[in-house]
Curated annotation (Swiss-Prot):
Pfam families: Methyltransf_5
Subcellular location as annotated: Cytoplasm
Documented EC number(s): 2.1.1.199
GO MF terms held by the record: rRNA (cytosine-N4-)-methyltransferase activity
Gene responsible for this protein: rsmH
GO cellular component: cytoplasm
Keywords: Cytoplasm, Methyltransferase, rRNA processing, S-adenosyl-L-methionine, Transferase
Protein name per the record: Ribosomal RNA small subunit methyltransferase H
Amino acid sequence: MAETFKHTTVLLDEAVNGLNIRSNGIYIDGTFGRGGHSRLILSHLGTDGQLLAIDRDPQAVSAASAIHDARFSIIHGPFSSLADYVAERGLVGRIDGILLDLGVSSPQLDDPERGFSFMRDGPLDMRMDPSRGVSAAEWLMNAEADDIAWVLKTFGEERFAKRIARAIVERNRVEPLTRTKALAELIAAACPIREKHKHPATRSFQAIRIYINSELDEIERALEGALQVLAPHGRLSVISFHSLEDRIVKRFIRQHSRGPQVPAGLPLTEAQLKSQGGRTLKAVGKMMPSESEVGENPRARSSVLRFAERLPA
C-alpha cells in the first residue's frame, strides 16, 4: 500500500477570503496540491459556481479524483498555461479569482522517492512532473561546472556555488550522483562555513529544483496569463515561500498597478494623456502567517501572501 503524506495548507483561510468569492463565480486554483484551497473555495460556491484546478504533479491530479463535485474539474499541466486552458473553455475575461500557492508541497518534500529533500535519501529526481523533462541527476551529470555554479548562485544565492559545482563535476567523473543523500553529503563537505540553523545543502537543493522545473519562468507566465483572463474586479491571490518568488509577484503587481510611466518634464501627447489611467491591477494587500500558524506548521514561516484586483478596462 502506498504511503500517504500529510499536507497542511499554508494561509488557507486568508488566501481564499482574499478572493472575495461570489457564490456563482468562476475560480481557478492553479496549484491543487492536495486540495486544501480547492475544498474551501468549493464550500463558498453555490450550485452555479465553478472551480477549475490545475497541477502538473500526477500525484496531485490523482488526489483530485477524490473530489466528486460537478462544479469541480482538474487539469494535468503547468499553471503557466492557465490562459490557454481558460481560452479553450471560452472563459477569457470571466474568471472571478485565481489562487496560486507557489513552490514545492509537503507531500513532494516528504516523499523520498520524489528526490526533493536532502533530509530523506531517495533518487535524485526533483521533477514536479516525473514524466517530463530531465531529472536533477541527469542534468548534474551532463552540465558544466560553470553552468551548475550559475544555477546555485542565481536560484539559491549560494555563496560557495563554484566550490560546490566543482565538487559535483569531479564526483560525477568518478561515480554518478544518483541519490539525494550523496549530493547533500557532498555539498556539506564542500562548504567551508555553515549557516546557523540551516543545513548546508538547503540553498543548493532549492536552486537545482527551481532550475529543473523552470519555476520562476512558470510564475511569470502564470501571472501574465492571470491578467489576460481575469474578469473586471477579479482577484489574484498568490502565496510565495522565498524571496525569489515574492520578488516576481511584488514586481508584477507593482508594474501593473502603476500604469504607463512617462519621464517627468516631457510634454505629453493626447494618446499619452489617455494612457495615464491605463492601470490594469490594484494592489490590495499583503499578509504573513500568524505566530500560531508558524508554531503549528514551521514551513509557513517564510510565506508571504499578496492580493491584487483586476481593474476594468
